[in-house]
Design a protein with these regions (language model features):
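Charge-dense, helix-prone N-terminal extensions
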Residues: 1-133
Length: 133
């Protein structure tokens, strides 16, 4: 059974609201969020962004593929179709039907290459979903 794609109106190439959110999150947690959202921004020319549920979301056009969010002690790098992504490094957490996230804490060393691969896989996945209807 094919699922309907989630779509967000108002995604822009560079949303000032996302930049404002980044400025509102200084310090180590904010730096972690900025670093990984920047990787999402650079996935392709069609990447758009917006704030949704209070956090930055990266989209292919209007179809979301990733987000970052800052919490008290950690940052989540999340994926809207994370349950479908290959994760040989077992970074993904969550038990929902679709979404998964990677929890990053200051002072720990994440598997940078594995997380980068997850972000690019999420972008490729949403691109295929959009192109194949």
């Amino acid at each position: 059974m094919k699922t309907q794609l989630l779509r967000f109106n108002g995604a822009r190439q560079r949303d000032p609201a996302v930049d404002a959110w980044m400025k509102e999150h200084p310090g180590e947690l904010g730096a972690i969020a900025r670093r990984w959202f920047e990787v999402m921004r650079k996935c392709g020319d069609e990447v758009r962004e917006l704030l949704h549920d209070g956090c930055p979301v990266a989209c292919l056009g209007d179809a979301p593929f990733g987000y970052v969010n800052v919490f008290t002690t950690h940052v989540n790098v999340g994926f809207f179709h994370g349950a479908a992504l290959p994760d040989p490094a077992r970074l993904l957490e969550g038990a929902g039907k679709f979404m998964r996230h990677v929890r990053l804490k200051p002072g720990t060393s994440p598997n940078v290459e594995a997380l980068r691969r997850l972000i690019h896989a999420a972008y490729s996945d949403i691109k295929a979903r959009v192109e194949n209807g």
